[in-house]
Amino acid sequence: MVGQRIRIRLKAYDYRVLDTSTGEIVDTAKRTGAQVAGPIPLPTVKNKYCVLRSPHVDKKSREAFEIRTHKRLIDILEPTQQTVDALMRLDLPAGVDVEIKAFEK
């Protein structure tokens, strides 16, 4: 797989779960002999929601909620076949969204 690059993009609401997942991916890739660039922290997206507390009146009484989406980017340079096999067998925790793209140089 000479001249290829694998880009892995991870998203999660909990940064601790995200960091453990990125650590597992980086360790697996390094163990199989691939070069790793990252994990690169991408900007956190904050979605804010404002909801009325009362179902009928009291417009002034509101409750605010916020959900943060944390993201990380990992590039695997010069992956071997063992790297791809190990990444396919890797079991990541629930709550982590994984996007994998392969590029030719």
UniProtKB/Swiss-Prot annotation:
Protein name: Small ribosomal subunit protein uS10
InterPro entries linked: Ribosomal_uS10 (IPR001848), Ribosomal_uS10_CS (IPR018268), Ribosomal_uS10_dom (IPR027486), Ribosomal_uS10_dom_sf (IPR036838)
Top-rank taxon, per record: Bacteria
Keyword NADP (UniProt): no
Function (record text): Involved in the binding of tRNA to the ribosomes.
GO biological processes: translation
Subunit annotation: Part of the 30S ribosomal subunit.
Signal peptide extent: none
NCBIfam families: PRK00596.1 (NF001861), rpsJ_bact (TIGR01049)
Family, per entry: Belongs to the universal ribosomal protein uS10 family.
One term of GO molecular function: tRNA binding
Alphabetic keyword roster: Ribonucleoprotein, Ribosomal protein
Disulfide bonds listed in the record: none
GO cellular component: ribonucleoprotein complex; ribosome
Organism listed in the record: Acidobacterium capsulatum (strain ATCC 51196 / DSM 11244 / BCRC 80197 / JCM 7670 / NBRC 15755 / NCIMB 13165 / 161)
